[in-house]
Amino acid sequence: MKFLLVAINAKYIHSNLGIYSLKAYAEKELRKKKKAALAGTGKLLSGVAEAGVQGAEWASDGAVVTETQSVAGMSSGQVQVEIAEYTINHQMDQILQDIYRRKPDVIGFSCYIWNIQYIRPFLKDIPKVLPDVKIWMGGPEVYYRAESFLKEEPTVTGVMVGEGEATLAELAEVYGEAEDIDIRLEQVRGIVFRKTSGGILHTPVRPLLPMDEIPFSYNNLEGMEHRIIYYESSRGCPYSCSYCLSSIDKTVRFRSLDLVMKELDYFLERKVPQVKFVD
């Protein structure tokens, strides 16, 4: 199961902090699920040994798997999250070809004022070449009008509303299991999605994450040598500018100062030429 997070930036030197943050958090949660599943397998092995269970099957790596064992937790390790960044100066055919080559099962588009009109044609073209792909949208250009956007774009499966880190991690788990997807999507907070029956469902608002729970987005700087790195030490805004979406929610959260200093040191040690705060 492959998730492809797509950003279409205004310039090559720009990067999309949002999708890097989503990827980092999703991978952290998937590792936790896999670790918990492996721990559960260890307990199962211990129980099998103590009880002398007959008829157990041995997997290729030597682990015992019984017919009744649930492998739900193990499948999280099979979910792959990739990032694809393009610019509005790319030819649309180039982008479509690259997305097709990556063969994603689920695509997530990061939508802003500078790319939403550029993205819309892909919502019609991608299903023509990848008919089974699920398309999800996120970002300020879609989540405040999620239901109307779904009505305008019938190929889109759903919209992530608000901050997407925890939401994407849960979506990855749902699609990784590939069972009772509609029922399980109803349990994912912070989405508006199109049910298989055609109806549109809003799930409850997702609580905001503490900033320190969001992992550092740049543990790998490969490919970032000539690009601007964006960094946030806080989210939210206390002001009420009428033209700005940030004024809708006046909640302000901060990353701990020690963590901010540690992460900025990481950039300095690697001689990153430019870091921009997006607070």
Name what the model sees in each region.
Residues 60, 212-279:
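Radical SAM [4Fe-4S] cluster-binding motif and immediate context
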Residues 25-35:
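A short, Lys/Arg-enriched amphipathic alpha-helix followed by its capping loop at the start of a domain
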